[in-house]
Amino acid sequence: MSKAPLFEKISVKGTLFPIEVSMKRLHLSHPYTCNGQEFSSLPMYDTSGLHGDCRTQVDPHVGLPPLRSSWNFPRTVQLGVAQTQMHYARKGVITPEMEYVAIRENQQLEEWIRSFNRHGKKVEPITPEFVRQEIAAGRAIIPANLKHPELEPMIIGRHFRVKINSNIGNSAMGSSIEEEVEKAVWSCRWGADTVMDLSTGANIHQTREWILRNSPVPIGTVPVYQALEKAGGKAENLTWELYRDTLIEQAEQGVDYFTIHAGILQEHLPYAERRLTGIVSRGGSIMATWCRHHQQENFLYTHFNDICEILKSYDIAVSLGDALRPGSILDANDEAQFGELKVLGELTKQAWQHEVQVMIEGPGHVPLNLIEENMQKELELCYEAPFYTLGPLITDIAAGYDHINSAIGGALLASLGCSMLCYVTPKEHLGLPDRNDVREGVIAHKVAAHGADIARGNPTAWLRDTLMSQARYSFAWEDQFNLSLDPEKTRAVHSQSIAASGYSAPNPDFCTMCGPDFCSMKRTQKMGKGN
């Protein structure tokens, strides 16, 4: 008899719509008991789509099947007509995407969620109605362009799992379309909840098309990068019309959210010029250059209503870019940063008038003692719209290890309410990341996000840790490997360590850190048995 796979792809049917929510199930080596419930397997949140299904071979030239096309909730693009999740949420209508993300967040663990009680805090499973309420209030978003049917919907908001974003994209210095598609798929395999294509080199349109057709997660872009390419690389040659046409081009391809640097105004530039590191946002520096050259207000700000007319037609979310994020800890929480944040709050209200979904981008480089103020200011000035941050990095001297630097700051900020962390790789400040850097960056930020979920009392996160602790205490090595965020690495490290020690058994009841005679857990078990 062939052995069942340890991981298998499963799908959970909806009750309101003909949807099937993709997850994976881990089969454990033996049952574990938690809070009186027995677990012989664990359903797990999965971002890999069909790319993670060993039974399916995805041809990148064909792409993924159009999952959402058969959901019996027809919406077509009509310019100027709101088609957004917020539009339906405010009308009291639950969409297929809302039911999908509710099922996905619960991970088939409703019984466990109801029984979970940590420090007197009771939790209920997430319902489609709760999702609708959070979207209607602007506290959560489901980025899902009508033109991206391959997408498996996900939700970003502080009452849901902390998400992470992976940045990919070519530059003028190298990388091909195939490499960037591979990085996008690779990101999804390791747990990226969204991917941003930040291509600035050749073939931007073609690269994005390939990525979208192969992506089960939302794809974001910074449209001003492509607009700048069309303007010959000169910021002063940008026009509203050129930018508008770029927005529509990317919207038609299926981009799910746009980073738009509409909050940097002429009045902010003197503050930025007094900084140690000035403006470190690429999009921010482009728009600052345009404003200074033309001595005019940022056209993304003056045309923001026009932008929203486009976004609401496709159900594209706006990620209000932090053009003035601090690029050094000395510049953190200064007048430039918080001045822009106030404008982002005003733009949030403006977007909501168009029923456009909004999230707010945040820093940046921020020392640990100033991180909490960032969360407080964002909630206050931006009306609790989801916060999406780059780290923050807590020191300026971690080059080569900035993924760890960022994950430390991100864990703290997410524990305080940040909704999504943008990953940083070991190549940050040094060069264009390759696929191994992408993996390192994703895993580091999955650690941060999961740690924040623990701090926020997420029952599904607590269950995974509890099972890991039980597996560790019982020396169930395969379960330990598979419950970790990177099973391949943990298995390889353990195997190499055992082999180097000369021990013959592959999975002994100790590790090489302590050896057979100094293992504290082994001794404790003997104490419990009366030995």
UniProtKB/Swiss-Prot annotation:
Positions that bind [4Fe-4S] cluster: 511, 514, 519
Catalytic function, reaction form: 5-amino-1-(5-phospho-beta-D-ribosyl)imidazole + S-adenosyl-L-methionine = 4-amino-2-methyl-5-(phosphooxymethyl)pyrimidine + CO + 5'-deoxyadenosine + formate + L-methionine + 3 H(+)
Binding positions for Zn(2+) per the UniProt entry: 365, 429
GO CC annotation: cytosol
Pathway where it operates: Cofactor biosynthesis; thiamine diphosphate biosynthesis
Top-level enzyme category: lyase
Gene3D superfamilies: 6.10.250.620, Radical SAM ThiC family, central domain
Coiled coil stretches, renumbered: none
Domain of life (superkingdom): Bacteria
Cofactor(s) required, per the database record: [4Fe-4S] cluster
Pfam families linked to this entry: ThiC-associated, ThiC_Rad_SAM
Keywords: 4Fe-4S, Iron, Iron-sulfur, Lyase, Metal-binding, S-adenosyl-L-methionine, Thiamine biosynthesis, Zinc
InterPro entries on file: ThiC, ThiC-associated_dom, ThiC/Bza_core_dom, ThiC/BzaA/B
Cofactor annotation remark: Binds 1 [4Fe-4S] cluster per subunit. The cluster is coordinated with 3 cysteines and an exchangeable S-adenosyl-L-methionine.
PANTHER family: PHOSPHOMETHYLPYRIMIDINE SYNTHASE, CHLOROPLASTIC (PTHR30557:SF1), THIAMINE BIOSYNTHESIS PROTEIN THIC (PTHR30557)
Its biological purpose: Catalyzes the synthesis of the hydroxymethylpyrimidine phosphate (HMP-P) moiety of thiamine from aminoimidazole ribotide (AIR) in a radical S-adenosyl-L-methionine (SAM)-dependent reaction.
Annotated protein name in UniProt: Phosphomethylpyrimidine synthase
Originating species: Chlorobium chlorochromatii (strain CaD3)
